[in-house]
């Protein structure tokens, strides 16, 4: 699964980092100038690419792969 992190787009990586910082979808949207619904769509794609079921697992994979430090 950690290899799958390499398949994330730059935007998806940015969103993953903001999730790791504890931001809500609305807060992430404000920071990257997207709607909360678009952020939710990005998170769904990240979840699918990584095969994760929740934000905590998504963040753990990001940390282990070095995307999040």
Q: At which residue positions do the language-model features occur?
A:
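Regulatory hinge/linker segments at domain boundaries
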Residues: 1-14
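A cross-family signal for key residues in well-ordered alpha-helices
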Residues: 17, 30, 60, 69
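Short helix-to-turn junction characteristic of helix-turn-helix DNA-binding domains
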Residues: 19-23, 62
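Recognition helix of helix-turn-helix DNA-binding domains
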Residues: 24-57
């Amino acid at each position: 699964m950690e290899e799958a992190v390499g398949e994330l787009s730059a935007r998806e990586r940015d969103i993953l980092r903001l999730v790791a910082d504890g931001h809500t979808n609305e807060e992430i949207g404000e920071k990257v100038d997207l709607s909360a619904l678009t952020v939710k769509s990005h998170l769904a794609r990240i979840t699918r690419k990584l095969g994760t079921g929740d934000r905590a697992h998504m963040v753990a994979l990001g940390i282990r792969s070095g995307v999040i430090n």
